[in-house]
Each structure stands twice: as structure tokens, then as C-alpha cells.
Amino acid sequence: MTLDPEGGFEQLMSMARGFQAAKMLTVAVDLAVFDFLDQPRSAVEAAAWLKADARAAGIFLNGLAALGLLVKQVDYFHNSEIASRYLVQSKDDYRGAILKHLEHTWERGWNDLQHTILAGSPQGVEPETWVDTRPRRDEEGVKAFIWGMDAVARDLAPQVALKLPLSGVRRLLDLGGGPATYAIAFAQANPDLRATVFDLPGPSEIARENIAKHGLSSRIDILAGNFLQDDIGSSYEKYDFIWISHILHSNDQRQCRLIIRKAAAALVPGGGLAIQDFFLNPDGYTPLGAAMFGVHMLACTPRGRAYTYGEVAEWLQEEGLAAPSLIPTSPEASVLLAAKK
């Protein structure tokens, strides 16, 4: 939310209370409340199923109903339409993984924001080894993050596929592709396209599962590695198009330039490079979503932040790409699209 200059103190109270609804939602997902309440149940039944205190369960369910996550009819509760669609684990459109990821970032990032602001980076994080050590120390958190990225991109990726110049592209690299959601959408929209998804070994296993689920294992390959350190596949084949989605914001400027340099070197002449991110305007604080995401990266990564589209455009041109165009892909994100000269 943004503040109304004409508004009163209640705006600040509303902002400060924002954590309450967020915590109720993530706790309900963690407890699988929505799985149980996809049919009407009483608070007593829910408490017994949850092995919870009956009084506490009743108060909690009424709070979820007040938020619109549950519907209450007399003494029975059941999922609202939106909760039933997105928050029941057995359903195809389940999106709870991203909510679990956001809860992890609260516990291990935002909760210690004051220290991070004073010290410059989160506690217990070694910038040079953060990417390699995180999967080993936090396997469940990484799994929630990668499937969460699928939850966020699932609706958007088919729309993005229609906005990119992929007609005629035969070899595409999805660099840092996570669950392969975008590679899947690009392959579905372009029958002649073959894709490679490059990411760390843990995310690569999730990508393999997701690709197989969509019947695209014969057209989408997996290449596991660390794109800051390893060859991204260009030593044996150049790519017609490289897609980099929501990768730069986790890295510092030196790392971002390295990523762009490696991508540019891996392209054929005339090949396209598309970078999607939460780009800031030149003023550095708009749009709101990008500015807030910049703080999110401050809280959760050793060196990440949001970048202006001008900064990234300059790096692209320094690596021999033409001046990029800016294509909005969602209310908060855009794509910088450039061709290799």
C-alpha cells in the first residue's frame, strides 16, 4: 500500500498490522486447513483433525472467514472459492509452495531486517558461497522456492511466450530456469523449438519432473551447474535465444555483468537475449512492486537488489547487443529484449 497524504494515523496502523493476515494465511497453509475444509466442517471437527486446542481453532477459523479465505454458515466452515482453487494440495492449481517460500523468507530474512540494514547483509550468509551451500543447508526451503516460482509463473508464462519473437527460434536457453515453467510455455507455443534449462542440481531435478509431467522430455534438456562458474552450454552449441527471468536481482552488479557477458557469448549473431525482472524506473523508487522487491532482496540475499532498466540496458550494450526494447509482462515486471549484433 502507499500512503494518502491527506490520510490520518490509521493508515500507519493498517500498514503495521499487515503481518497479521499474512501470518494467518501461511499458518493455515502449513496446517493444511484448506485441505480439510474443502467440505463443510465444524470448528470442533477441525480442531480434532488438527489435534489443536478447540478454543484456539474456533478463533482462528473465524479469523480466516473474516479475511474471506473461509465461508461460515451457522457453525460450519468451508473454503472460499479462491482458497478451494489455489490452496488445496490435491488440486492441479495448488499454489501453496510460494506461500511457504514467503514464510521462509520472513523467518530467515525479514525478521532480521534491522540487523541487515545496519550490517549490510543478512547474518550467517557468506556471499561467495551462498549459491552453492544453500541447497545443502535448506533443502526443503529450496524446494518450496522452486515450486513457488512455478506457482507464480504458471499463468504468466504462456502470455510472455506470445510477446517474444520466438518464431524461427530452434535452440533456446532458459538460464536459471528453475522449474522450467517458461521453457515449457515456450515449447508449447513453438513446436519447432528445442530448449535447454540450466540451473543448480536441486532445481534441475524439479525441472525434470515438471517437464515430464507436460510430456516435453524429448524437446527440453536439462543442464545442471552454477552459471556464475560453469560453462552454460555454449562450448558445443550456440543458442538462437536466451531467456533470463528473475535472476539478476539475486546478484550484485559484478555478477550481473558476468551473467550477461556469458549469455552474449553463447548467442549466435542476431540471436536474442531477453531479461525479465522487477525493473526500477530511473528515480529508483517506482514502481512500488520493484522497490519493495529490492528490499526483499536486501533482506534475503547477500548482495541482491532491484536494478533500473537503464542500468541493465547499459550492460547489454557493453557486451555487443543492440539497444534493448522494454516490454511490460505484468503489472510489476518487464522484459528487456536485445539482439546480438
Annotate each language-model stretch with its function.
Residues M1-K72, L166, R171-K341:
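Alpha-helical subdomain
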Residues T2, F9-F36, R41, W49, ...:
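Conserved Class I S-adenosyl-L-methionine-dependent methyltransferase catalytic core
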